Amino acid sequence: MSSEREERTFRSSPVQQDDVRENISNENQEHPSPNPPSYASSMAESQTLLPKRPIIGGQTAKLQNKNRTSVHVAFADLPRDLPEIPDGISDRRRVHKEQQHLGLDTTPPVPPRPLSRLRDVNSHDKLPSIRSPRNLNYQPSVRSSRSGSIFDDAPSMAPPGGSYVSYGMHDDGSPQRPWTPSSRVSGFTRSDLSRPPPSDGMYEPSDLNGSPRPGTPSSRYGGSPRRPLPPAPLFSNSRQPVPPIADDATISIPLHDTYDDDVFAPESDLSDARPHPVDRSSYMSSESQDTLNEGDMEDYDKVEHYGPAPTGAQERRGVRAPQMSRKEVQLINGELVLECKIPTILYSFLPRRGEVEFTHMRYTAVTCDPDDFVERGYTLRQTFGKTVRETELFICVTMYNEDEIGFTRTMHAVMKNISHFCSRSRSRTWGETGWQKIVVCIVSDGREKIHPRTLDALAAMGVYQHGIAKNFVNNRAVQAHVYEYTTQVSLDSDLKFKGAEKGIVPCQMIFCLKEKNQRKLNSHRWFFNAFGKALNPNVCILLDVGTRPSGTSLYHLWKAFDTDSNVAGACGEIKAMKGRLGANLLNPLVASQNFEYKMSNILDKPLESVFGYITVLPGALSAYRYHALQNDETGHGPLSQYFKGETLHGQHADVFTANMYLAEDRILCWELVAKRGERWVLKYVKGCTGETDVPDTVPEFISQRRRWLNGAFFAAVYSLVHFKQIWFTDHTLARKILLHMEFLYQFIQLMFTFFSLANFYLTFYFVAGGLTDPKVDPFGHNIATVIFHILRYACVLLISTQFILSLGNRPQGSKKLYLISMIIYSIIMVYTTFATFYIIIHQLTSKDDKIEMGDNVFTNMIVSILSTIGMYFIMSILYLDPWHMITSSAQYFILLPSYICTLQVYAFCNTHDVTWGTKGDNVMKTDLGGAVGKGETVELEMPSEQLDIDSGYDEALRNLRDRLEVPESPPSESQLQEDYYKSVRTYLVLTWMIGNGILGMAVSEIYSARGIGDNYYLRFLLWSVAALAVFRAIGSTTFAVLNVINMIVEGRVRLSLKAPRWMGGLKERVNDKMSSVSSNLRS
């Protein structure tokens, strides 16, 4: 019976009989091990359940065919320090049998686990293990922490080495993966092999595309298709948590101290990590000694695992991109035009829903130049269907990369102005439906430059929708994306919705998103030549994003054109945005600009309006009569000259013209007034005001003034050179005389601007040098002389430094240097102002010198101060706006040297730079996809597919294989242009610098610093300043008087004057005379 039992044992064992029979028989003779009767049958059953297929791979121990005798056994080299097997039955087994006999065995059975396999690189050093099928009744080992195993009654074999990687024991709560090697075992259909019920924890679904999660927004929109969601944790439902591991390698430590009498006692691992699975059939196969590691790896690759951790920013869970689909669309006149429904949420609270303009947003992909917009058959909603309307007022809002705060500030103010138009119920032009005569056009310069939040604001108003724009239509590049919608809601600067309950009326909006960044001049060409030509409006208003017009400003601008048919352009008052309670005025830079803007609107603009020619209508808030802008039959006119600067290239471009177009708002002014055969005039409207942001940092301030100063200088030169064009206009003789007086005034101003640097130095030299006289020295001990020489040398060095900085450094890269220079200039100005007032006070209190009005220092100083500061106060009070004199005048006078030196030096040294600080975008983008089709039908494709990426890669490989030579490109037009402008810049800077240097050195050598009374040049300088100030005041006063007369004539101020009866018809004759005088002044 013993031999038969051994025969059955060897027949069932996975080890080769010929190789191990002798070792096992010897061990059984010394220490016989009791075998349970069911052992052989259990092993036979396990062999029938496992498939027997060969797998090729690396070397390890396997079952061999019985007829093969000379085969190397992998576990022959066992460790030499194995524990010795004791004689007889062990104490542990004896105690275990006694507990079984008495029924005291309380060891809980462990549920069966799925079949697995062990994986180890050094498999030839390990003893092959055997795992029995599930749910078989085995006798458990003594005091074992796990259920009974087949090893409890296995033949006596040596334990594995210390490098053996044990199988991590898991609870039955571990979910079964969708595919594992154990699933290949046929015949297992028991419930213990099925996946356990889901746990209570919430985690991402295991579906690749991300199925919805309960209780999250993704249950409505679905998961994100861009990122595969990880499956549920492997041991989410296990009863015992698995501790984290630091390494995949595990170390097996035999517990000899506790189970020194049991060779097959359980081993403890330092790590509970689950090792890599190994195919169990490799141990049960009897065909080859070689296992197939490659096949094992193929099986392992099919096992689902977590994968690497995602890198970079991840999308918010529950939100995904809109699903795109392909649709066939019918072209309209060969062009792509789409009518898109507005969002449901926006539609839900609209008060008006009866027309398509309220329920659908219209998208047009424009593939032509703006000059060909109408000729190519493009239309706007106001030109066809039920929405055919006459456009009275066309408003243009240009923007580049401004944020949503600046955009909503401007747009909400515009919509409140439209509400004011509709509130004028007694007007013959406006009224309740007045909004139908107003169209607002927003032109954005560059699709990739626009601020994303600004697009969000437009989308909230219903004007813009993401995902419908295309880069090309039938292989024609799209130049601009045009969105049309009549919105009924507005967003204020606090990003709060305002609707009909706040008085907001519908607003017809056109949003033109240019594909490329081509500067502001091109944006105006889209407005005037494309949309203006299609709508043919009466008045066009230009606004910049960030400017906030007051509630009635646009009405006052339009009214100026309605009351005077000779007005071709008008502008309002630009105010600096002072912030809440004037907090921005704490910044000296903002305060100085506030003073400058105020005095320009009090002195300069009214004077120029009296003459009829305003040198600059600010683009931030101005208006033009569209009919006056049109070209004549030969194509020459204001618009042709205005857009001439957009096509200047290379050395053929005129540097004066290029710089003049930096201040493009000055060009239309001259072209309108000097238009042949017309009598157009420009007007300043005092009732129109608009607030705008001003630069609050030094680099931004210098860059802005560089454009303004160069544009103003070259535009003034252009108008003075071409002043003869006025002779060919239809202006009256009186108007032509007034215009020539203005040209003379501009010429004098231009000369003072050109020599302002030398005049500043000479003023400082003579005034501050006047304190060096020991009789006048306020400090004594020649301290004033030391201070004067220090400041004099500092001024000369500072001016020289300004040239070096301006020629080689950008303001953004030299913030501290420019700031330090402005601080030193302020110190020089403060000392010069102190010297001026001290000299005047010394003359008043001196006993030796008599106070006389005449040719002396006292008279010259008093006249100069009263003509500047005094005149500023008087005119500000006359216009009932004196507060800037209190809050901002000191900051302006302190920073005045910086205006003269820093700004003008930088401007003249950068006349070669004719850009706005941005470069044109000439690269064709294809990120939006295109509309491709045949005939009148196109198919809208999704963005780039994998096939497109592969084709581009293949083309690159073919170019490398064929070694295609890249031709050398000639010098670019931009490089030629830059070289030419730099040469002109050098000549201009040299001329300007030498001229100012000669004047300063000559006058300083002729007149000493102490002889102020005999200084004729200083006398001329002071009296010239006074004369110019008085001239400006006269013009401003004339404007105010004419306004009063105009109010009287129009009946807004009624005078009830009763004449005596004996005077007869004198009253009627006086009224007729006043009417005739008013009509002559208007002409």
Curated annotation (Swiss-Prot):
Bias type Basic and acidic residues, positions: 1-10, 18-30, 78-100, 117-128
Q: Name one GO cellular component term.
A: cell septum
Superkingdom is Eukaryota
- A GO molecular-function annotation: chitin synthase activity
| Subcellular localization(s) per the UniProt record | Cell membrane
* Keyword Lipid metabolism in record: no
What residues are glycosylation sites in this protein? N23, N67, N417
- Residue ranges for the region (Disordered) are 1-248, 260-294
Kindly give the membrane topology term recorded for this protein: Multi-pass membrane protein
Q: Member of which family?
A: Belongs to the chitin synthase family. Class II subfamily.
The protein's name in its UniProt record: Chitin synthase 2
Q: Which organism is it from?
A: Fusarium oxysporum f. sp. lycopersici (strain 4287 / CBS 123668 / FGSC 9935 / NRRL 34936) (Fusarium vascular wilt of tomato)
Lineage of the organism = Eukaryota, Fungi, Dikarya, Ascomycota, Pezizomycotina
Write the gene name: chs2
